[in-house]
Amino acid sequence: MRILNVTETYAPFLEFGGPPVKVRALAHGLARRGHAVNVLTADWGLEKRLRHHSESDLQALGWDRSPFGWRHAEEGVQSIYLPSWFRYRALSWNPAVKRYCRARLQNFDVVHIFGIYDLLGYAVAASARSRNTPYVVEPIGMFVPIVRNVWLKRMYHHFVGQRLFAGASTVIATSDLEVQELASAGVALQKIVLRRNGVESPGSWPVRGKFRASLDIPEQAKLILFLGRLSPKKSPDLLLQAFGNLPERIGEHTLMLVFAGPDDNSMQQRLTTSASRLGISGRVIFSGPLYGDDKWAAYRDSDVFVLPSQNENFGNTAAEAAAAGTPVVVTEQCGIAPLVKDVAGLVVAHDETSVANALERLLRDPQLYAEFVSGCAELTSRLSWEKPVSQMEELYANLTPPPVSGVSSRPME
């Protein structure tokens, strides 16, 4: 099959969190099965990132220019980065999308659009409808507007989103929670398909202690980790309040809290002020965003990972923490909660008392903690990408006509 993935953000722009990681995992998994997979995305500053490389280096790394923008080839997947004429947060305006669709869209059997609050996906969906090309929409947790520009997002749903979903052959949800949200908002239940996310562990793990050493965190300290965008939706402020309710020490162990992730709308400054007011500044560290080995080192060196979100369609970071063998605490509003519960950690209400009680229970009960460490391996074994990739392959096949003899399955620009 010839598959086009459309996403506002994609590797190497990992600062946008989970979506680039998810799209790449699915794309590479399908390419390994022999499908022609292309990714259409926005350019968030490749010129700056690649300027130190020579032309020969760029070619060796799989980079070159296409008629539409930068092009990258990696493990059988070709990605096109459309120039961005305007950028605001994770939204861009990419006029070249119209030209791309006119020239290339007819080459694909199916289109998969990730995310809903952007112009790129909407433009491709409109073009796909006009060509009777089936397309799949995956909201990636954006469907319910929780924070930031809520009324604007509701207007988008009314004027744009309804058409996007109405024209979709299938809408992907990654948890039972997201299925309920979509159905309650009027998306036809027979159109919704549940497909969980996966987790991809590193081939080799960073040396234990590397992350703590980088931040001068003592080996004997009990380390609580939050890793993700410092966004109101993810409730880092609730975690800080919960941490402030905990004792400074449990037994011989000092408790420390690390926030690892990009700032969002000055949230870090508000957290810093709150930590000072609570008298815990000396035990709260902001590491900034972490990627690659640094991210996995943080998971591995932590004692507990916390995802206290107001709403989370799945919760990839909790799955990653479990893959590193670190027990987790997640709120009931996280899609991954049913998989985590009493296997790899605790599921709690979205309030500071519940989070604080769960953390103290985990850190004071070595037997329970050891059970959850073992459970992390069990959860990870259930979260490989193989099943989600197989599910998407079957879904796409049901949406597309039989292949025409002689048509290339090679990725296209």
Mark where each language-model region is.
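Conserved donor-binding/catalytic core segment of Leloir-type glycosyltransferases
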Residues: L4, P218-K234, L240-F243, V258, ...
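Glycosyltransferase donor-sugar binding loop
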Residues: G45-L46, V199, L227, M256-T272, ...
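A short helix/loop element that forms part of the nucleotide-sugar donor recognition site in Leloir-type
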Residues: R51-F68, S204-I217
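Nucleotide-sugar donor phosphate/pyrophosphate-binding loop at the beta->alpha transition
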Residues: P134, V144-G167
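Aromatic "clamp/platform" in nucleotide-sugar-dependent glycosyltransferases that forms part
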Residues: Q310
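Short hydrophobic beta-strand element within catalytic cores of glycosyltransferases
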Residues: P327-V330
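Conserved acidic donor-binding segment of nucleotide-sugar-dependent glycosyltransferases
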Residues: D342, L346-T353, R361-Q367
